[in-house]
């Protein structure tokens, strides 16, 4: 009886293992509705990595190079691995303050990037962005003209898709070597935060 039972148990275990093996594929099966257009909003912090420009330092001023940041973006996901995205980001203020005076610089950026995604599970992906930016720099000094700068931007993050139309991101992005000329100087701006994504179909 035992000799007859052992082959039967072995066959049963082998049959049960086949569906599990078939499910363990890479990349994972895709969540529904991941293709097509999407829009989103981002919230977090921005930091001018090189501090305050020389033009607004001195005179006993203290530099505050970090500020709340928000952004809006729209994109189109071509397939599970690639998307294209345009975005606007308010990079906040850099402030140099003293007991009797203060100077501020406000920065905002438009960007156009390619997005590469790496699926980890059915709903969770890592991603990277690479593209270009155009930054507007504005001073609180009325006699100083605004400045524009263009350059490269890149980002790393993770995305979770709910399975419906919504997704959530955590993301770090750098706007590299923002060159505003003699007054504004050169700075790197980093943003760190979360974003909510809504798929339009």
Protein language model regions, located:
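Gram-negative outer-membrane beta-barrel domains
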Residues: 18-201
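Bacterial N-terminal signal peptides
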Residues: 7-15
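Bacterial N-terminal signal peptides that target proteins for export
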Residues: 1-7
């Amino acid at each position: 009886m035992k000799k007859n039972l052992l082959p039967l148990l072995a066959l049963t275990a082998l049959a049960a293992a086949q569906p599990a093996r078939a499910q363990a594929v890479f990349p994972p099966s895709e969540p529904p509705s991941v293709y097509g257009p999407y829009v989103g909003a981002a919230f977090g912090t921005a930091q001018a990595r090189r501090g305050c420009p020389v033009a607004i330092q001195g005179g006993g001023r203290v530099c505050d190079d970090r500020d709340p940041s928000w952004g809006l973006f729209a994109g189109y996901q071509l397939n599970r691995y690639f998307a294209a995205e345009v975005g606007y980001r308010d990079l906040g203020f850099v402030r140099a303050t003293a007991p009797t005076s203060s100077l501020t610089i406000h920065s905002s950026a438009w960007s156009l990037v390619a997005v590469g995604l790496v699926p980890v599970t059915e709903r969770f992906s890592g991603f990277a962005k690479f593209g270009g930016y155009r930054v507007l720099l504005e001073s609180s000094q009325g006699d100083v003209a605004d400045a524009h700068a263009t350059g490269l931007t890149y980002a790393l993050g993770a995305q979770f898709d709910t399975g419906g139309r919504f997704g959530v991101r955590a993301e770090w992005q750098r706007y590299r070597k923002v060159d505003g000329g003699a007054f504004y100087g050169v700075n790197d701006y980093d943003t760190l935060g979360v974003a909510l994504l809504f798929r339009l179909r």
